[in-house]
Amino acid sequence: MEIEESNLKWLRTEFIATKKPPEPKAPLQPPLPPSKRKGKPPKSPRRRSSRIKPGDLIDYRNISLIGRFISQQGKILSRRVNRVTLKQQRRLTIAIKQARILSSLPFHATDQLFKIKRKIKRRESTARKKRKKGFRKRPKK
């Protein structure tokens, strides 16, 4: 069954004419300016200072440095908590494990480690208190 070319043109025009364009679901609105947008404002990138200074040596013998990166339970703290880079965190974990094996650091939390810290804190907090002016001792006559 052959359809003539003129009939084909007519079919095409009829089909296109009866087809309706899709209606938009919501009216299109221009984007709001940044001051009128809802939600959280954009955060500016903030550079955090590292707890390890450039001159510090990450080593199993440097216990004063390593001790800052261990929790009270004796666990190694995460990178987020420590605020160190990936390379520094890897070196820290290796140094902590070496210090534990050589028994410089305990595997579990001990009282001795935290008693030392408490003593240091007490010494710092027992600084001289300023006397109030109204309560001075009067010299004896």
Curated annotation (Swiss-Prot):
Q: Where is the signal peptide?
A: none
Predominant place of localization: plastid
Read off the InterPro entries from this record.
Ribosomal_bS18, Ribosomal_bS18_sf
Q: Which Pfam families does the record match to this protein?
A: Ribosomal_S18
Location in the cell reads: Plastid, Chloroplast
- Name any GO cellular component annotation: chloroplast
Q: Which UniProt keywords apply?
A: Chloroplast, Plastid, Ribonucleoprotein, Ribosomal protein, RNA-binding, rRNA-binding
Describe the family membership recorded for this protein in Swiss-Prot or TrEMBL: Belongs to the bacterial ribosomal protein bS18 family.
Q: How does it assemble?
A: Part of the 30S ribosomal subunit.
The protein depicted here goes by the name Small ribosomal subunit protein bS18c
